[in-house]
Amino acid sequence: MQEHIRKISALVLSGAVCMGMGTAVLAQSSPSPSGTYQPGDKTNQVPPTTTTPEPGPAGTPPSPSSPYGAPAQPSTTPPSSTSPSTTPAPTARTIDLNAVTSAQLVRAGLDEPSAKLIEQNQPYTKPEDVLQVQGLSEQTKAALKANMDILRANPKMK
């Protein structure tokens, strides 16, 4: 019975870690809520959408004056003649393994024991070093591997 409970707990925990890390990745790839757009800015682009015309009453085709009957017009905005901005694009949210606290790791989706182990083994010289921490479960290591692109190991400033 206890073994069954342990297996279920491990499954739920790994699902929570994966869900938390997936949520963090999605939050980073989402456009900012401010909704501001600057010409040439590719961080807040909205993918083009198309609408299917809805038939009128009794299956008649929609009239051209109907908002659903007008064919979709592609945007013909001319390309900007100015050079792209020289300021770097805002970077996605990253996690500095040498500055992160266990509470921040828990909020990112890790379980508390794994988060404490990661914090106790600081400093790291490169992000891959976190995978060598003794005591991390395979599920936690898999979640960390899947999110290696957002992990950093910046040297601690004194």
Curated annotation (Swiss-Prot):
Gene3D superfamilies per UniProt: Photosystem II 12 kDa extrinsic protein
GO cellular component: photosystem II; plasma membrane
SUPFAM superfamilies: PsbU/PolX domain-like
Entry superkingdom: Bacteria
Topology in the lipid bilayer: Peripheral membrane protein
Annotated spans, Disordered: 27-94
Location in or out of the cell: Cell inner membrane
KW Transport (keyword) present: yes
Segments of skewed composition (Polar residues): 27-46
Compositionally biased intervals (Pro residues): 54-65
Bias (Low complexity) ranges: 66-94
Gene Ontology annotations of biological process type: photosynthesis
Chief location bin: membrane
Signal peptide as annotated in the record: 1-27
Keywords assigned: Cell inner membrane, Cell membrane, Electron transport, Membrane, Photosynthesis, Photosystem II, Signal, Transport
Subunit note: PSII is composed of 1 copy each of membrane proteins PsbA, PsbB, PsbC, PsbD, PsbE, PsbF, PsbH, PsbI, PsbJ, PsbK, PsbL, PsbM, PsbT, PsbX, Psb30/Ycf12, peripheral proteins PsbO, CyanoQ (PsbQ), PsbU, PsbV and a large number of cofactors. It forms dimeric complexes.
Protein family (similarity comment): Belongs to the PsbU family.
Function: One of the extrinsic, lumenal subunits of photosystem II (PSII). PSII is a light-driven water plastoquinone oxidoreductase, using light energy to abstract electrons from H(2)O, generating a proton gradient subsequently used for ATP formation. The extrinsic proteins stabilize the structure of photosystem II oxygen-evolving complex (OEC), the ion environment of oxygen evolution and protect the OEC against heat-induced inactivation.
Full protein name: Photosystem II extrinsic protein U
Organism: Gloeobacter violaceus (strain ATCC 29082 / PCC 7421)
Gene from which this protein is expressed: psbU
